Curated annotation (Swiss-Prot):
Annotated positions of the Omega-N-methylarginine modification: 690, 692
Modified residues (Phosphoserine): 32, 36, 664, 684, 783, 798
Biased composition (Polar residues): 741-801, 861-884
Protein species of origin: Mus musculus
Region of interest (9 X 7 AA approximate tandem repeats of G-S-[QR]-T-P-X-[YQ], motif CTR1), residue spans: 748-811
Quaternary structure and interacting proteins, as annotated: Interacts with SUPT4H1 to form DSIF. DSIF interacts with the positive transcription elongation factor b complex (P-TEFb complex), which is composed of CDK9 and cyclin-T (CCNT1 or CCNT2). DSIF interacts with RNA polymerase II, and this interaction is reduced by phosphorylation of the C-terminal domain (CTD) of POLR2A by P-TEFb. DSIF also interacts with the NELF complex, which is composed of NELFA, NELFB, NELFD and NELFE, and this interaction occurs following prior binding of DSIF to RNA polymerase II.
Underlying gene: Supt5h
Ranges annotated as biased composition (Low complexity): 890-905
Binding site for DNA: 617
Modified residues (N6-acetyllysine): 712
Protein name, UniProt field: Transcription elongation factor SPT5
Length: 1082
């Protein structure tokens, strides 16, 4: 077919369409004629197509073939090339199916084509017949009243709110939101200040170009500023102090997220009865409460809680103090269950309403709980976990409480803390009580390996169907709650809680099983913030310090210096105290430092040993591994301690005063006996020096005591020595230090240097009697009245100075309790009443250092009760004799009769020169010595003795006053475990007359446990007297050669007692009742 024919075909088709549009309203015969024309067209098209195909085969067509026209919207499939046609392989009937599909497609095309043609004809008629106004009205009705919303929803009234609000959403042409960093807590105030700034600049030349400021409640530290440009934001926030952090950096909020800034989504908690909540405000702020029932319609909730009733206010209101009660500052009353009887006793009116009690408009249960309604906004519902102590307040038995009832937020799963390796137990469902081990955790799905013979495969459970289980002996760690971070060993497992023994504080802790986790490590003892640790010394207030003995999540438990455990918050602990170099003095005047091992000899912790952890003034904090309370920490006074490895109380065989620096010129005088050993230096007898720079081999290996300096009182072994210094290895700290030899004293030596003094011996200088200043003159004291010491006032120190005892300062310094030095300690530093005599020093400086009568050399091994041969005082110059007379002329001391007899066993000579015993072999003291030993100063009367130098006859004893008992001038009778009575001479009248048991003895001081008062006090032995035993009592020998022996008192014969001793032979002995003390019966 030629091009002309093709163009003729297209022209005929166009003219045909136009004629159809023009003849839209002609008669049917004309339409039928047009239809006949349409029937002729397909025939002509078929002929032309055949001709076209023949010509195409003959000629090479350079241009692409023209696509066939189709009147519909469906395009025919592309023809397959002839080379790939395999018609022979088709199944039967396939061609029929294709033909039917082609016929249906052609029918659809014809229908669509008819609709298009009819629409075109109508449009042509409108343009031809109608005027412009009518056309405009036609288009307005067609396009103005129809919209997508009407098409979908059927009308404007039925449109949803979301679609109607679409036009209010921000777009690209609207101002943007910019986030600006702000000071936390000042968001609202900053927004108001920007508003005021905007108003102030509104009518100026440079107004602010921001649109708004948003400060949402839930956003902390940021505000939103609405503006077109970032420069406008910077102009607005310039000069605002709270926004200086965000001046250089503002971030634009994306358009899609701008609506979320103002979106408020409030989740309503799904509260159930018996779930737990906390109050937000008011008098019950932060109190735990249990949900009774919920009223969703009224948005209220009824709670069960522990009431807070101000009983003092009720009492004041019912009295004349009502006006003052109103003016009193408000005080939050403590939590306490409702007590109807107490309210009625105070004058309150309590009514009854069924099962409830009504008081002041509130309802109370019979058990004392308050039931009250609150608004939903007044309670905290999320994340409320009651502690075990709070649960115990709500029920008598915590086992009865459903601990699994927790608050669950809508759409959220309950939190769990399961981890791989935990031992769990199924608590719900068909496999209840099945135990297993957690293998993996995937959200709320827990995979476990069951511990059952028949179940070998892994099982998957929801978290709410599992619970942790533990067995006794497991080592666990607390991962939540009050004791978070603590570790311990499980000692008991109950139904709903576990008891574990803390590794750090050695306390028993009650913890919920869900708050535990198996672990192998031990707690570090450091709090959550890492600022404090267990055992640390902290300051509670300007006058009080303490040691942290328990670390909790929000609080500390601190053992203060007064021995009380207080609970404080972390913020209340102001600062840590560093006392690594603190030094204190123990009861023997030894220096004690941190980390020294000491023993407690007095006070409530008497008998314990421990390591010094902290020293603060006169208090020492010690740690004892055998003590369970407070993790082994306890506090006591430094004067109640004795350094382990330090010097012991000086006995009568020790004349050591080496290394002592005299505080009085009289002591340093060459004639004074205490000064003799100081002139020759250490280890130089008679003051002869060994030479310079040479090693002192004699001193190496000896045990020495340091008498001065920071290590005063320490005992050690000399490793090396020269004529000036010595290297000493200390026993207590195992360290070697260099010490000046002048500060060293051998422990087993009589003097540090020089010879033994003969000062004060009589007869002296050619049998001269009396010796100067000895007090052996006749008449004695010069007609003193009263004669006996006990009745003299003042009793102590009636001479000034009294030899060395009443001098100020004394030899041992202001802290020696043996001397009335000035100044002395303040009374408030003493924990117990000490009457007028504190703990005595091991050595008495108040007497003569050498015996006045008679003279003898220092015995190397003194015996307790050696035999003696009496001699007369006229024996000339007894300088080197071992025999003395117990009936010598009066001297500043007395002596005991060695064997008991019906007569008095005391033979003493009172003298104002000193109150020490004359330590002759007749003394009961186990180690007699030429040194004067002050056992216990006492105001009691001393024994009778002749007042002339002549020796009385053996029978010339002056009998004691009947009922005088044991001579109280000595503490030799004092021993442990015997029952004693407090005498009337004691100052504290509250304990006078009480009986007690001696627990320990230090010098002349006794730690006595009083039965009536149930406390331990420290009392001098002069204020005590032993209780006389009766028949069949267990007794202890307190004097004589059988001292410390025990037995049973079988019978009493006058002043004697018949005793069966507890020794292996159980021999029978007869002893004076004054020699016996009543033992404490178990």
């Amino acid at each position: 077919m030629s091009d002309s024919e093709d163009s003729n075909f297209s022209e005929e088709e166009d003219s045909e369409r136009s004629s159809e549009a023009e003849e839209a309203e002609v008669e049917e015969d004309q339409r039928s004629a047009a239809g006949s024309e349409k029937e002729e067209e397909p025939e002509e098209e078929e002929e032309e197509e055949e001709e076209y195909d023949e010509e195409e085969e003959e000629e090479d067509d350079d241009r692409p073939p023209k696509k066939p026209r189709h009147g519909g919207f469906i395009l025919d499939e592309a023809d397959v090339d002839d080379e790939y046609e395999d018609e022979d392989q088709w199944e039967d009937g396939a061609e029929d199916i294709l033909e039917k599909e082609e016929i249906e497609a052609s029918n659809i095309d014809n229908v669509v084509l008819d609709e298009d043609r009819s629409g075109a004809r109508r449009l042509q008629n409108l343009w031809r017949d109608q005027r412009e106004e009518e056309l405009g009205e036609y288009y307005m009705k067609k396009y103005a009243k129809s919209s997508v919303g009407e098409t979908v929803y059927g009308g404007s009234d039925e449109l949803s709110d979301d679609i109607t609000q679409q036009q209010l959403l921000p777009g690209v042409k609207d101002p943007n939101l910019w986030t600006v960093k702000c000071k936390i807590g000042e968001e609202r105030a900053t927004a108001i200040s920007l508003m005021r700034k905007f108003i102030a600049y509104q009518f100026t030349d440079t107004p602010l170009q921001i649109k708004s400021v948003v400060a949402p409640e839930h956003v902390k530290g940021y505000i939103y500023v609405e503006a077109y440009k970032q420069t406008h934001v910077k102009q607005a926030i310039e000069g605002v102090g709270n926004l200086r952090l965000g001046y250089w950096n503002q971030q634009m909020v994306p358009i899609k997220e701008m609506t979320d800034v103002l979106k408020v989504v409030k989740e309503v908690a799904n509260l159930k009865p018996k779930s737990w909540v906390r109050l937000k405000r008011g008098i019950y702020k932060d109190d735990i409460a249990q949900v009774d029932y919920v009223e969703p319609s009224q948005n209220t909730i009824s709670l069960k809680m522990i009431p807070r009733i101000d009983y003092d206010r009720i009492k004041a209101r019912m009295s004349l103090k009502d006006w003052f009660a109103k003016r009193k500052k408000f005080k939050r009353p403590p939590q306490r269950l409702f007590d109807a009887e107490k309210i009625r006793s105070l004058g309150g009116d309590v009514a009854s309403d069924g099962d409830f009690l009504i008081f002041e408009g509130n309802r109370y249960s019979r058990k004392g709980f308050l039931f009250k309604s609150f608004a939903m906004s007044a309670v905290i519902t999320e994340g409320v976990k009651p502690t075990l102590s709070e649960l115990e307040k709500f029920e008598d038995q915590p086992e009865g409480i459903d601990l699994e009832v927790v608050t669950e937020s809508t759409g959220k799963e309950r939190e769990h803390n399961f981890q791989p390796g935990d031992n769990v137990e199924v608590c719900e469902g068909e496999l209840i009580n099945l135990q297993g081990k957690v293998l993996s955790v995937d959200g709320n799905k827990i995979t476990i390996m069951p511990k059952h013979e028949d179940l070998k495969d892994m099982l998957e459970f929801p978290a709410q169907e599992l619970r942790k289980y533990f067995k006794m002996g497991d080592h666990v760690k607390v991962i939540a709650g009050r004791f978070e971070g603590d570790t311990g060993l499980i000692v008991r497992v109950e139904e709903n809680f576990v008891i574990l023994f803390s590794d750090l504080t050695m306390h028993e802790l009650k913890v919920l099983p869900r708050d535990l986790q198996l672990c192998s490590e031990t707690a570090s003892g450091v709090d959550v913030g890492g600022q404090h640790e267990w055992g640390e010394l902290v300051q509670l207030d300007p006058r009080t310090v303490g040691v942290i003995v328990r670390l909790e999540r929000e609080t500390f438990q601190v053992l203060n210096m007064h021995g009380k455990v207080v609970t404080v918050r972390h913020q209340a602990v102001t600062q840590k105290k560093d006392n690594r170099f603190a030094v204190a003095l123990d009861s023997d005047q030894n220096n004690i430092h941190v980390k020294d091992i000491v023993k407690v000899i007095d006070g409530p912790h008497s008998g314990r040993e421990g390591e010094i952890r902290h020293l603060y003034r006169s208090f020492a904090f010690l740690h004892c591994k055998k003590l369970v309370e407070n993790g082994g920490m306890f506090v006591c006074k430094a004067r109640h301690l004795v350094l382990a490895g330090g010097s012991k109380p000086r006995d009568v065989t020790n004349l050591t005063v080496g290394g002592f620096t005299p505080m009085s010129p009289r002591i340093s005088s060459p004639m004074h006996p205490s000064a003799e050993g100081q002139h020759g230096g250490f280890g130089s007898p008679g003051g002869m020096s060994r030479g310079r720079g040479r090693r002192d081999n004699e001193l190496i290996g000896q045990t020495v005591r340091i008498s001065q300096g920071p290590y005063k009182g320490y005992i050690g072994v000399v490793k090396d020595a020269t004529e000036s210094t010595a290297r000493v290895e200390l026993h207590s700290t195992c360290q070697t230090i260099s010490v000046d030899r002048q500060r060293l004293t051998t422990v087993d030596s009589q003097r540090p240097g020089g010879m033994t003094s003969t000062y004060g011996r009589t007869p002296m200088y050619g049998s001269q009697t009396p010796m100067y200043g000895s007090g052996s003159r006749t008449p004695m004291y010069g007609s003193q009245t009263p004669l006996q010491d006990g009745s003299r006032t003042p009793h102590y120190g009636s001479q000034t100075p009294l030899h060395d005892g009443s001098r100020t300062p004394a030899q041992s310094g202001a802290w020696d309790p043996n001397n009335p030095n000035t100044p002395s300690r303040a009374e408030e530093e003493y924990e117990y009443a000490f009457d007028d005599e504190p703990t005595p020093s091991p050595q008495a400086y108040g007497g003569t250092p050498n015996p006045q009568t008679p003279g003898y050399p220092d015995p190397s091994s003194p015996q307790v009760n050696p035999q003696y041969n009496p001699q007369t005082p006229g024996t000339p110059a007894m300088y080197n004799t071992d025999q003395f007379s117990p009936y010598a002329a009066p001297s500043p001391q007395g002596s005991y009769q060695p064997s008991p007899s019906p007569q008095s066993y005391h033979q003493v000579a009172p003298s104002p020169a000193g109150y020490q015993n004359t330590h002759s072999p007749a003394s009961y003291h186990p180690t007699p010595s030429p040194m004067a030993y002050q056992a216990s100063p006492s105001p009691s009367p001393v024994g009778y003795s002749p007042m002339t130098p002549g020796a009385p006859s053996p029978g010339g004893y002056n009998p004691h006053t009947p009922g005088s008992g044991i001579e109280q001038n000595s503490s030799d009778w004092v021993t442990t475990d015997i029952q004693v009575k407090v005498r009337d001479t004691y100052l504290d009248t509250q304990i006078v007359g009480q009986t007690g048991v001696i627990r320990s003895v230090t010098g002349g001081m006794c730690s006595v446990y009083l039965k009536d008062s149930e406390k331990v006090v420290s009392i001098s032995s002069e204020h005590l007297e032993p209780i006389t035993p009766t028949k069949n009592n267990k007794v202890k020998v307190i004097l004589g050669e059988d001292r410390e022996a025990t037995g049973v008192l079988l019978s009493i014969d006058g002043e004697d007692g018949i005793i069966r001793m507890d020794l292996e032979d159980q021999q029978i002995k007869i002893l004076n009742l004054r020699f016996l003390g009543k033992l404490l019966e178990a």
